[in-house]
Each structure stands twice: as structure tokens, then as C-alpha cells.
Amino acid sequence: MTEDQARRSGGVGRRRFGARRKVCMFCADQIRVVDYKDVKRLQRCMSERGKILPRRRTGVCARHQRSLTVAIKRARHMALLPFVAAHIRS
């Protein structure tokens, strides 16, 4: 493969198709409402620093992302989740 052909095709050994679309974990488990008490599931949608991850990182659908945000904020208010990470506080 010449250098010009490699550049046009995206390089040597590149995948022909894009990355696979992520499936919403709440839709896959048929969960209608995100529960603020389900801390393990909420932590999967948060960064190490305690920030809420965007949809493009988690693969959650728009409906569940809105309810996920509310659930995380409720869990923070009830002291089930931290507002910031422990290493940042000290």
C-alpha cells in the first residue's frame, strides 16, 4: 500500500467502521426511574473527581441522563455520594 493510499483509507490496519454505539444501561436493564439510593450504579456515571459524566462517555439515553442527574444530586444532598473527591478535599 502506498503512502497516498494509506492516507486516503485512514491508515494501515484501520477499522472500516466506526466504534459501536453504546447502549443505555438503564434501558438494557428495563429501569424506568433512576433510584438515588442505588449508589453503585450512580458511581458508574461519575468521574473520579465526583463530576457527572456526559452522555457521550456513559452511553446513557437522554431521558435517563436527565433522571440520572437529578438522582446524583439527591444522593449528594442525602450524603450518599460526595460532592468532590476525597483527595481534593484535603
Swiss-Prot record:
Domain of life, per lineage: Bacteria
Family stated for the protein in its record: Belongs to the bacterial ribosomal protein bS18 family.
Indicate yes or no for the key word Cell wall biogenesis/degradation. no
Ribosomal protein listed as a keyword: yes
Query: Its function?
Result: Binds as a heterodimer with protein bS6 to the central domain of the 16S rRNA, where it helps stabilize the platform of the 30S subunit.
Write down the Pfam families for this protein, in alphabetical order. Answer: Ribosomal_S18 (PF01084)
What does the record give under GO molecular function? small ribosomal subunit rRNA binding; structural constituent of ribosome
Which protein is depicted?
Small ribosomal subunit protein bS18B
Cellular component (GO) terms are: cytosolic small ribosomal subunit
The record's keywords, sorted A to Z, are: Ribonucleoprotein, Ribosomal protein, RNA-binding, rRNA-binding
PANTHER family named in the record: 30S RIBOSOMAL PROTEIN S18 (PTHR13479), SMALL RIBOSOMAL SUBUNIT PROTEIN BS18M (PTHR13479:SF40)
